[in-house]
Each structure stands twice: as structure tokens, then as C-alpha cells.
């Protein structure tokens, strides 16, 4: 297959710097990018004249798998109630855990696949999907099975086992023990990562450490939600654990940045959540100045019902003190780094999987400017067309 006459091709050089190639063709053979060359043609060539070809978005942090909705919380927040206020009233994560725990696998799958389809239509070609809304081992099994069914359709899915919240009326350390003794052994062979929500209203630093130790013993790669609501010392755990990414970081102090840098973790910022919760945005440049790789992800969830990575890029450029070029890098190759898949995807270069999108714009600088428009004319996952003329192909 050939993508010919590409007006602009976005990729990155060997040092990871943004690189723009104009008026070239991309040759794809056996679902792999084989060449970027002078314009070629064949009967099946896709004409990308006056369009932008770029790596598909790597949405490296999502909570897309669940049952139920939480639209009432929008109106609660509009009347001044905070995330923690809603949580303490039995809403937030607790409501979704109850809804998901009481739902069958088919219901979870049918609701989740619709959200995944929306993400794909907006240019995502690789997804991480977390569990975490099942209170019991059976609830988590239904959730993880639903995610595995989605992976059988789209292939480019990583699964994360998430210690998300302590169910109502259960002691935190008792539940951490339940998670360690039941969840991790049951699912360690079904998932790619272990994640813990370490924050006020979730897991304390001590119980987080206990869960992470069990993850290490089970040879799981680690992630952590940290410093979203308050700074309770979770980032200090970078000194002990090898995280692939540390995510949220709204309240991370400057003196803690070296812990992230020294660990080699990717710092994932989630501007759509800041928008949805009307909270402060992360200053991404603080991390970039420390030579820390920054990723952008959607954090799509019942609290922030938006998986549009183009909107995430818009918010990052507008509010997170990051250039458009670095934001695109954060939403592609750095997202791939956070999932340990950057050797095979996240950039357009020979030898990598053909995970790419063709945008119906003539200049990449219009990407965040036109964030409310349908921009993804074509999308390819592993060289297979999944969006054709703005329509999804299953």
C-alpha cells in the first residue's frame, strides 16, 4: 500500500525531535512502514495531497471500561461540590464501582466498545485500558474479560490492573490485603501493568507500597496515579520502584522532579481531567526542562467523558505551557514509551507498525485550532484501514 503526495508527514528524528517531511509518499508492506520516499503511485494508492499524515495517538491512560454513567456530578460540581465532596457522598468512583460490580460482562463490553469506537474515530491507534471498577475478584474478572474482547477486535490495547479505590465500609489495609492476595494472583497473566491510585480519598502511601511490592513479586510493570488531589508523598516512591509512568502530577513539587528523572519514568499529564473537574493544569515545561519525557493522555472516565486526544492536545497547548510540537510528541511517541511499545509504534519510520492517521487539514498547526472538527479522514492500525472517509470500519 502507498500513501502518496502527503502534504506534511510528522515524525521524529533519531534524537526524538519533531520532524516535518513535505510532499513524500509512505510505502507500507506487510503492515509495516517500509519507506518514506519520493512520490509513488499504484492503483490502490491513497492520495494525501494537502493533508497531514502523522502517527496515530497513543492514549496511554484511560478508564474506558465500566458500566453506568455519572452525569449528575456535572451539576453537583457546578454548585461548588468538589471531587472529594462527591466521593464522600457515595458518588464518584464508588458509584461506578457499584454500577460495574452489578453488571454482567456483556453489558460492560457493549458500553465500553462504544467509547473505544469514539476514541478510534478521533485518531487513537493504541489504547491502554485500566480495570479498577470491580470491587471483588468476580467484578474485576468481568471487567478484564470485556477489555480482552475489545483487544481481540482492535489488537492495539494494553491492559492495566488498577487498585483504584477502597470500597465503602471496608478498612483500607484489609482491602489492600484482599487486592494483594486475590486480584494480583488472579490477573497477573492477563494484564500488562499494575497501577495504584495513591492519593487523598484513595490508597495511602503505605498501602500503595504494599500493593506495588506484590506487583514486583509478580513481575508486573508498574504505573502510579500520583498528586492529582493532594501531595501525600507518592512520587517519592520513584526512589524505590521502577515505574513506566507516573500520572496526573498536579501537585508534584519541584524538589520531587529529580526522583522522576532519575527513575526514567514518563510523566503523563491529563489536561482533559483538569478541564472536566475545573482544576489547575500541569505546567509541562517544568518536566521538559528537567529532561523528563512527557506524555499526554485522555484519562477518559465516568468523571471525564472525553477520549478525544485532539482536544487533549488543544488543552495542553492552551493551558499546560507546552509547544504544539512537544504536545504531538507527548501524544504519540512518548505515550508509546510509557507503554514500552516505542520500538514498534508511535512514529512514522521504516520498520515500525503502520499505526498512522491522515488528517483532513493542510497544516499540522491547525490540529488544535480545529479541535471540534472531524479531522481524521483515514486511520490505520497495523496497516489495516479502520477509518475510511471519516467512517469506522470494524
Swiss-Prot record:
N-formimidoyl-L-glutamate binds at residue 133. Keywords: Cytoplasm, Histidine metabolism, Hydrolase, Iron, Metal-binding, Zinc. It is found in: Cytoplasm. Zn(2+) binds at residues 61, 63, 225, 299. It comes from the Archaea. It catalyses: 4-imidazolone-5-propanoate + H2O = N-formimidoyl-L-glutamate. Fe(3+) binds at residues 61, 63, 225, 299. Its EC number is 3.5.2.7. GO terms for molecular function: imidazolonepropionase activity; iron ion binding; zinc ion binding. GO terms for biological process: L-histidine catabolic process to glutamate and formamide; L-histidine catabolic process to glutamate and formate. Pfam families: Amidohydro_1. Binds 1 zinc or iron ion per subunit. 4-imidazolone-5-propanoate binds at residues 70, 133, 164, 228. GO terms for cellular component: cytoplasm. Its cofactor is Zn(2+); Fe(3+). Pathway: Amino-acid degradation; L-histidine degradation into L-glutamate; N-formimidoyl-L-glutamate from L-histidine: step 3/3. Belongs to the metallo-dependent hydrolases superfamily. HutI family. Catalyzes the hydrolytic cleavage of the carbon-nitrogen bond in imidazolone-5-propanoate to yield N-formimidoyl-L-glutamate. It is the third step in the universal histidine degradation pathway. HAMAP family: HutI (MF_00372). This is Imidazolonepropionase. It comes from Picrophilus torridus (strain ATCC 700027 / DSM 9790 / JCM 10055 / NBRC 100828 / KAW 2/3). The gene is hutI.
